[in-house]
A protein has these predicted regions:
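Prokaryote-biased recognition of long, low-complexity C-terminal linker/tail segments
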Residues: 5, 164-213
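Intrinsically disordered, low-complexity regulatory segments
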Residues: 1-161, 165
Length: 213
């Protein structure tokens, strides 16, 4: 089985527990396992300029930019590790995978993007643990779940990523054009900034008052 963790440190911890102690270039091997890792997001949603050359310039008339078919990119500094994972997935002795990325929405997305970008069709299971203690890892491998059990989690993560893209790309370009300087807008960033601004305004307008208890 090929086990894919979210980062090298987690992969090393898992490998130590399941007996994959032989170090290779970009992965570890042993006891019937291959253990490798992502480096955060190996695959990301492509920027607007990937869809059309004219989107590389920020113009009001091009808004909104609404992709009909989402495209993905692999950053140059992460291509080597992606190629390693894809190569491992294609090995004939790999009959299945274990998704061992972080137990959460974002971890699910990181694995699924790599899995799909690599064109892998092999079945996978999910390791869902919240502790990297040896006992927790052993227990997690004893209770692996079918990967399909987490399809809805992946869909929610994908929806979040696409929503961030649509709001970030379009709103940032719109307000930057209107204000004639870069003004970033984000689905989470901007409401959070509003909370801070409101709080600062209250602090600035505070006036001392006498009161009695």
């Amino acid at each position: 089985q090929l086990v894919i963790a979210e980062k090298p440190s987690v992969a090393r911890s898992i490998a130590g527990v399941i007996g994959a102690d032989k170090k290779q270039d970009g992965y570890m091997e042993g006891n019937g396992y291959l253990v490798s890792w992502c480096i955060g997001h190996l695959v990301s949603l492509a920027d607007a300029g990937t869809y059309d050359e004219r989107f590389k310039k920020w113009r009001y008339d091009d808004l909104p930019i609404l992709p009909q078919q989402w495209q993905y990119i692999i950053p140059n500094d992460k291509k080597k590790q992606f190629d390693t994972l894809r190569s491992l997935m294609k090995r004939p002795d790999v009959t299945g995978l274990v998704c061992a990325t972080d137990a959460g929405r974002e971890g699910e997305l990181i694995f699924r993007f790599v899995y799909q970008m690599a064109g892998c069709k092999k079945p996978f299971q999910r390791l869902w643990i919240s502790s990297m203690e040896d006992a927790a890892i052993k227990d997690g491998f004893a209770h692996l779940k079918p990967g399909t059990d987490y399809d809805n989690l992946y869909q929610s993560a994908l929806c979040r990523a696409q929503a961030d893209w649509l709001v970030g790309i379009n709103a940032t370009r719109l307000f930057s054009i209107l204000y004639h300087k870069t003004l970033t807008v984000g689905r989470v960033q901007t409401p959070t900034l509003k909370i801070l601004v409101d709080r600062e305004a209250k602090i600035s307008s505070f006036q001392k008052e006498k009161y009695h208890i």
